[in-house]
């Protein structure tokens, strides 16, 4: 099968973890898939990144891009999407792992389901003790758009962000920023971004537990979060939840789904109250 895929790996200050991510994708060069690694800013880890680049120099499909100054995590993610010139695109975090066998199966699934915009695998979550859980990723294969939206806003993880996407559809997704005091924070931004995918088509699951995206949920994260002071943190959280539902309404306007604003206004109020009382995500707290 001919692959027509770009895998984008954004990275910042984590060359050792990046090496593991790249090694998970080493494969037969006859398979047509691009791997683009975007290094966010030249700093004291530059030489380590260059050593990784040198170690894969014979892999013509792997390329490194170095941003002279730091552009930030969000811009680095979107940069990789925007330079994609293949039919399909997926992100891989620099501290996670995937495989070409998985990517092949995700493409087959999309090729056979033309109404789908994204194919997502099972999710293996690992902690610092190397304990892991295999989790079925949230997916939304309903033909009715309104049913997908209901299910998404009620109870979802953001794992399908790391699925395989039709690049044309993904390039229509957007996120700018939150209001103050979360203007520089990125917590939950994927949920807003992914609403564009939900409104464009189905999100389908690769039903094979042997092929999994591996998420290492530990280590230092180099992106801005909400304020750490307790009172301010609680205020920031409430404002962010309000902001997210407001941004969902803007998505409905963007896709001319005006009736959805009327339909979802009461559910949004209910869900906002739920989020404030119980915190989020309600049904996705995972214990090892």
Language model segments and positions:
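Glycine-rich, basic loop-to-helix element that forms the pyrophosphate-binding segment
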Residues: 67-84
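Short aromatic/hydrophobic "clamp" motif used to bind/position activated sugar donors
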Residues: 89
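Catalytic beta-strand/loop signature of glycosyltransferases that borders the donor
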Residues: 122, 204-211
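Short, well-formed alpha-helical segments that are part of the catalytic scaffolds
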Residues: 14-27
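Short, flexible, basic/aromatic active-site loop/helix in glycosyltransferases
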Residues: 136-156
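A short, conserved alpha-helix in the catalytic core of glycosyltransferases
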Residues: 169-173, 181-207
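Acidic donor-binding segment of Leloir-type glycosyltransferases
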Residues: 25-65
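Conserved donor NDP-sugar-binding/catalytic core segment of glycosyltransferases
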Residues: 101-134
């Amino acid at each position: 099968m001919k692959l027509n895929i770009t895998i984008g790996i954004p990275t910042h200050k984590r060359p050792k973890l990046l090496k593991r991510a790249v090694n998970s994708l080493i494969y037969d060069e006859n398979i047509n898939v691009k791997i683009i690694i975007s290094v966010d800013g030249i700093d004291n880890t530059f030489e380590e990144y260059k050593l990784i680049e040198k170690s894969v120099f014979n892999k013509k499909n792997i390329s490194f891009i170095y941003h002279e100054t730091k552009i930030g995590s969000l811009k680095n993610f979107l940069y990789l999407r925007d330079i994609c010139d293949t039919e399909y695109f997926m992100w891989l975090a620099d501290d996670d792992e995937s495989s070409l066998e998985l990517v092949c199966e995700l493409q087959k699934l999309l090729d056979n389901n033309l109404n789908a915009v994204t194919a997502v695998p099972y999710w293996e979550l690992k902690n610092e003790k190397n304990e892991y859980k295999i989790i079925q990723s949230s997916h939304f294969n309903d033909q009715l758009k309104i049913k997908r939206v209901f299910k998404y806003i009620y109870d979802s993880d953001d794992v399908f962000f790391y699925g395989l996407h039709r690049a044309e559809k993904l390039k229509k997704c957007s996120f700018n920023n939150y209001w103050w005091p979360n203007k520089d924070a990125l917590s939950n931004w994927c949920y807003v971004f992914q609403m564009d995918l939900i409104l464009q088509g189905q999100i389908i699951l690769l039903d094979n537990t042997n092929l999994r995206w591996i998420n290492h949920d530990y280590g230092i994260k180099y992106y801005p979060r909400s304020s750490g002071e307790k009172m301010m943190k609680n205020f920031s959280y409430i404002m962010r939840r309000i902001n997210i539902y407001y941004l969902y309404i803007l998505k409905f306007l963007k896709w001319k789904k005006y009736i959805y604003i009327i339909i979802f206004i009461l559910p949004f109020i209910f869900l906002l109250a739920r989020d404030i009382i119980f915190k989020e995500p309600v049904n996705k707290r995972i214990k090892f």
